């Protein structure tokens, strides 16, 4: 069975993430969506909220063979512990590739048996970023349906707007 881990902060999970998960399923038998913690990032949602939201979204979409987990160490260590041989990374633009390629080189030094698969974003999701969702959430009456599922919007709205 070919298994891949798709790590990210998912702060929050977006249609861009979901598209990459769906496309990963065309390549792999099982995909683990790994809600990761990067100590150098400032998050809008807590670790528990990001994990819970990702899990609820994946469940609502009825994906078979997609599982959600969380981890705060090196992704390559998670893959090794769980006998996963592939890491999937999404690429929106050239600057994403530079960052992800450097990450691949570090991971390769840590464990050369785990490979990274780069998936370019679909054209319709090139502009979809969690950062934009966070910024747009502060505007009232903005349509975020192109960025996030309704479940995500409602959860964010109840936390930040309906206070």
Swiss-Prot record:
Its cofactor is Mg(2+). Pathway: Cofactor biosynthesis; coenzyme A biosynthesis; CoA from (R)-pantothenate: step 4/5. Keywords: ATP-binding, Coenzyme A biosynthesis, Cytoplasm, Magnesium, Nucleotide-binding, Nucleotidyltransferase, Transferase. ATP binds at residues 9-10, 17, 90-92, 100, 125-131. It is found in: Cytoplasm. GO terms for cellular component: cytoplasm. One of its GO terms (biological process) is coenzyme A biosynthetic process. Its EC number is 2.7.7.3. InterPro entries: Cyt_trans-like, PPAT, Rossmann-like_a/b/a_fold. It catalyses: (R)-4'-phosphopantetheine + ATP + H(+) = 3'-dephospho-CoA + diphosphate. Substrate binds at residues 9, 41, 75, 89. It comes from the Bacteria. It holds the Pfam family CTP_transf_like. One of its GO terms (molecular function) is ATP binding. Homohexamer. Belongs to the bacterial CoaD family. Reversibly transfers an adenylyl group from ATP to 4'-phosphopantetheine, yielding dephospho-CoA (dPCoA) and pyrophosphate. This is Phosphopantetheine adenylyltransferase. It comes from Borrelia garinii subsp. bavariensis (strain ATCC BAA-2496 / DSM 23469 / PBi). The gene is coaD.
């Amino acid at each position: 069975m070919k298994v891949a881990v798709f790590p990210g902060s998912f702060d929050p999970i977006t249609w861009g993430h979901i598209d990459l998960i769906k496309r990963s399923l065309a390549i792999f038998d099982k995909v683990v969506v790994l809600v990761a913690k990067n100590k150098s990032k400032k998050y809008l949602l807590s670790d528990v909220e990001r994990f819970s939201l990702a899990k609820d979204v994946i469940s609502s979409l009825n994906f078979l063979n997609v599982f959600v987990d969380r981890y705060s160490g090196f992704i390559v260590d998670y893959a090794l512990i769980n006998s996963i041989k592939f890491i999937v990374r999404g690429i929106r633009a050239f600057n994403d590739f530079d960052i992800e390629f450097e990450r691949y080189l570090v991971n390769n030094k840590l464990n050369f048996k785990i490979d990274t698969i780069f998936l370019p974003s679909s054209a319709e999701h090139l502009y979809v970023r969690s950062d934009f969702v966070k910024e747009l959430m502060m505007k009232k009456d903005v349509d975020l349906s192109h960025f996030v599922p309704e479940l995500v919007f409602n959860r964010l709205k109840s936390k930040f707007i309906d206070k």
